[in-house]
Amino acid sequence: MKDSEHHHHGHNGFSKFLHKLGFGKSKGKSHKSNTSSIHERENTAAKGPASNVRPARPNVSTSSTSNEVRKSVPVGNPTVHTKTGSSSSPASKMRNTVNLQHIQAANQKTRNAEGERKVAQRRVQSDKAEANDAAMSSSAPTVDVSEGNSAAEPKITPDDSDTPRLNVDMNDKINVDEAAAKSDSKLNVDQINSTTESEKRVEKVNPNIANNPLKSPDAVAYSSETVSDEKQPTEHPVSANVPAKSEKAVCDENTKISLTNTEHYKFHSLRGDVEVVVGDLERDGRDTSLGDASVNEAAKETDVDSSRFISDEKAVTEDAMKTEHASNAPLTDERHFQFHSSEGDIEGIVGTMQRQRQSVSSYDTIVPSQFYKQKVVQNSPPSLLSTDNKIPESGSDHPSSQDNSSKASLVENSQTQSSTPRKPLPTTTSPKVNPEPHSESISDTRPSTPRKVPPSTVPKMNPKLQGGNSVTAPSTPSKVLPAMSPKVAPKFQGGRSSTAPSTPNKVLPAASAKAAPKLQEKAASFDIPNKSTIISTKSTVASPIKANENSPALKSKASFEFPKELDPDGTWNAPIPYPDANCPMAPTYRNLTSEQEEMYEEVLKYCLELKEIPVASNSSKKTDLIELERLWLTRECILRYLRATKWHVSNAKKRIVDTLVWRRHFGVNNMDPDEIQEENATGKQVLLGYDKDGRPCLYLYPARQNTKTSPLQIRHLVFSLECAIDLMPPGVETLALLINFKSSSNRSNPSVGQGKEVLNILQTHYCERLGRALVINIPWAVWGFFKLISPFIDPITREKLKFNEPLDRYVPKDQLDSNFGGSLHFEYHHEKYWPQLVELCKSRRLGILEKWRKMGSKIGTSEWDLKGGEEYVELMQQYVRPSLTNRSSSPTVTPTVNTDRQPKTLTNSADELSPQKRRVENPKPVVKDEGPVSIVEDEESTPVVTKKEDSIPVAQSTKADAGLDAENDLLPKSGSGVSETPAFSHARDVSTASFSDAVSFITADSIE
């Protein structure tokens, strides 16, 4: 008992000792249990290895000090006693005290070493910063330190404190921060990471790097003198004597957009084209190459040809020639092309056909294959080198006929010019080059001598675009375009006449004659075209063509504007550019009442004051009207909305704005034909021919549906409507809808939501656009639907609907598809039809845009004037389509109405998908394979089957049975004229939408 008490008191004293040192806390355990456990461990350790009890570690706390002790304790347990005896003996206390002192000393030594290492690192960094400051600024004061301490390691003074102190002898007690402020040097690591006055000093030294996020000891703020002495790269080089550009003209580094390619950039820099190097960054909502905006703006402001504006001095440094630029933007529009082609800028015309899936001007596709292919094929995308744009050989002047030596000299000349400062040519008389044109090529009927005008007509450069530079126009000799094939001409001319009204040319100043020989050699090697041959100097609008059948301009125009896709078997594979020559055309809305004219003026005034509209229907952000949106607001457009709203002015204003917002949000002006061409791969929507009133005919074949229900189907329908509007002649505002429901299926109609969206688009945004709807082979479901809604349809709309009637009453036979009873044997081949439709619509659209610009870009311009008016009528009357007498061996059938069997259309629709199983009382005649079969036409153009010596008039011996013919006798195996090509068979099996678009279109017009 006494022994237990003795151990208890002894251990209690040791616990108090540990507690004073901050180690041994009992954590709620009794002293008795602690004393007994320690006593047992000490006795067990004294007995030796025979004991099964494992020796324990000393009881230490989990504080930070305990962790440090635990890390520095050597292997083993230093507190375990090896001799028996009381734990309260002086020897035991001494041993514990000595062990703790050793641990503290080791920990202190470790901290001191770590502190020395950090101080040494700071000193090295400080020395580096001082060395950099001394190198950058020789006059900057330096920090003096005691000798020997600059390179030696810092000394640590012994101290009881845990934090070591750096003993640095500073001469005259100069503060480090003050020395750094005087020397404008970089601060140390601790000071640079905090927002102090040092950052303000950096801003004063060099404002260009004030916002530099780089904060490191090596990031030294250069002085303004040092920055100015260094040679900075020229991002947008101009002539050496040109004054500095304004801040607006200089492109920011983060948003800079380069010219189209390196050769393009070098060419303009070589010639000193200020407005090409300097320009706005954005136009029409997208990034463009520098300089395009300035050219267009100058042309708009002066309303004359946008010729080159070049500074008086043309010296360009060699460093500017070597500047490389990435190509991110295509040539933008026709104005840009007109600017470059007017003076023979081949590199200026060179561009990319499509970058980032953006449609660009058609002129970018022709020049690269003609000239640029020889030079930078490795830098051009594959689309530039397509075989469709190749130009056939036409004499020795054509680039394709040049030999390898001429090509080598071409590259050599271009390299020499791109590395040598040049000055423009002196004013010279253009050489008269009159190559013999191709039989179907573009011919220039005007004299090639340049015309001069007084200097007062030369436009002044916009100061914003030229950056404060005064510029004048130089002279360049005119040259003649070589002969070109008809296939290239449509893309090159965009559907406009090759002749243009004469416009005076600018007076060009003389320049140094040193550069003349080389530049002439390069121009000769390029065979640069004459600007008068390519395009009008003032506008691209075609001049009226005289009614002369032998006019070379008319022949050339017909050779490149209109497609010729007549196969040897008589099949037509292209859209038709003009309606029938006897089609009457006249301006609309000329006989308005005074009240209607007042309503129109009120809405027109509202549109003129309309500056900005929302970007979307559910958005509060507004932007200004773009050029195409203002072009859309024609006189006829405003009157259409007044008619659709029953001449209610407020409703017309609201609907016009709603349509503008929808067109912007839907992207009508930016629709890419490549995006939706898959939807029309089977020809389910075809624009072909015109009716007797000049309306373009839009054919719908629901059975040719080839895609699943998706928003892309709606975009395809909108694209077809826009193309139909482009093809409308002047004075025509509506289209004719022709629907053939043969072999269609209503198994899986589109969703109700999509049907509502289509209906809303047609009745809200394409009001007053349906002129006539002609439907054949109508199934019972559609027939019943229209019978059901017939009492609710507007009487005017009801008159537009024609079911199962002979369509030649409304459409000329030579413009009506043979599937609908016409004599035009049309078979849809996507690879032939689609590119020609896109090109024809693009040329019409560009022609309208150019006429609108020429007329002043005003809202409320008449569509009759924009689409050509009398000029269009004259061309329509002179246009003759290729002969269609070469027909296929199958007879064409003219459907007629059998009123006695009319109800059968409502009961026999179940057999629409299997025409072989039909039973019709009056089938068509079957022609046996006993001899050759051909088609002849009598005086009334009635198709007749001729076999050996017998001939049977088809139209007299058969009837169409209201569209339900026995076409099992006219399947493809027997040579039917009905288009049933294998390309459509696979698509009809996955039909997903039968007649949604047709029904929606007719219903939308009736709702209005």
UniProtKB/Swiss-Prot annotation:
Membrane topology qualifier: Peripheral membrane protein
Organism phylogeny: Eukaryota, Fungi, Dikarya, Ascomycota, Taphrinomycotina
SUPFAM superfamilies given in the database record: CRAL/TRIO domain, CRAL/TRIO N-terminal domain
GO molecular function, one term: phosphatidylinositol binding
SMART domains reported for this sequence: CRAL_TRIO_N, SEC14
Protein name: CRAL-TRIO domain-containing protein C23B6.04c
Entry's localization field: Cell membrane
Keywords in alphabetical order: Cell membrane, Membrane, Phosphoprotein
GO cellular component, one term: prospore membrane
Residue stretches of biased makeup (Basic and acidic residues): 111-131, 170-187, 914-931
Biased composition (Low complexity): 885-899
Predominant cellular place of this UniProt entry's protein: membrane
Biological processes, Gene Ontology terms: intermembrane phospholipid transfer
Organism: Schizosaccharomyces pombe (strain 972 / ATCC 24843)
Residue ranges, annotated region (Disordered): 1-247, 284-306, 374-514, 883-982
Annotated CRAL-TRIO domain residues: 675-828
Bias (Polar residues) ranges: 79-110, 374-389, 397-432, 467-478, 495-505
Membrane-spanning parts: none
Chain positions found as Phosphoserine: S525, S559, S888, S890
